[in-house]
Amino acid sequence: PFLAYYPMILVHNPFPPAPNSVDRNEQDNKKNFVDMVNYMDALVGRLVDTLEANGLRENTLVVFTGDNGTNEVLHSEFEGEQLRGGKGYTYDHGTHVPLIANWPGRIPEGQVNGDLIAFSDFFPTIVEAAGLPPKNVTDADGWSFWPQCEGRKGKPRDWVYGYYFPRPYSKKFDDKYNHWEVRYARDERYKLYDNGDLYDTQKDVLEKSVVDRERSSSAVKRARKKLQAVLDSYPNRGAQVDYSKVEGVYPSEMKR
């Protein structure tokens, strides 16, 4: 057995022409990004071809995913809209990424699943897919989504927890790569930050309008209570952060 981890830097900024680009233009970020994505697809195809050539295709789980949203200098079309990239931000354009799982003969073709999945779920999923004893995996944060891969219902997540403090020792904080420490919990619709701000991500994907606490429906109140319980179940500070060295200026105009 083997595990191969291949993090491509190809579609990362800056955005020069791809190796196979025609009409090369160093300044055309949008065209070059599209070329990069197409070239990345070709490289994935080479990996799959190599598995087939070595007789490993039918016994290999292939998982393809992104690690964050697109760079903000790019606008992509999605469902008829032009959306600015959200890399570095905590709203959906920065955290909601593609995930494809493929295993001929094991994962039925053509499935689309909208369950919540976090990166912490990958380890228990791979363990279950390999038929290995789970040991203490179920005591960790990850939930296996292998049953869903096989077309079964499984045990879908009811929430996802997020913690973001990328550069705790910055001299000045902002709402992006030097983001101030933030924690949140979310379900398929609502997202609650540790400062009490709740957002309806289906109606307000860019999180511009806080849900009014006083005018909330019973369903919204239940969601808030559930997500607050999730936040309360995790430490409220980063275990690896030396807070005596956190001296950056916190901009007062930030929402959170």
Enumerate the language-model features and the residues they cover:
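Loop/turn elements at helix/coil->beta-strand transitions in domains of secreted/extracellular proteins
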Residues: 1-4, 56-62, 96-97, 155-157, ...
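Active-site His/acidic residue clusters
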Residues: 1-35, 71-73, 77-81, 206-207, ...
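Beta-strand elements within well-structured catalytic alpha/beta cores of enzymes
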Residues: 2-7, 37-40, 44, 51, ...
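Short, solvent-exposed turn/loop segments enriched in Gly/Ser/Thr/Pro and often Arg
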Residues: 4-16, 64-70, 141-143, 164-168, ...
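Histidine-centered active-site microenvironments of extracellular/periplasmic hydrolases
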Residues: 14-17, 25-29, 49-106, 118
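Soluble non-cytosolic domains of exported or imported proteins
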Residues: 31-34, 38, 113-120, 139, ...
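C-terminal cap/loop subdomain of S1 sulfatases and analogous C-terminal strand-loop tails that border
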Residues: 70-90, 107-111, 115, 120-203, ...
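Long, internal low-complexity/basic segments
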Residues: 122, 168, 175, 192, ...
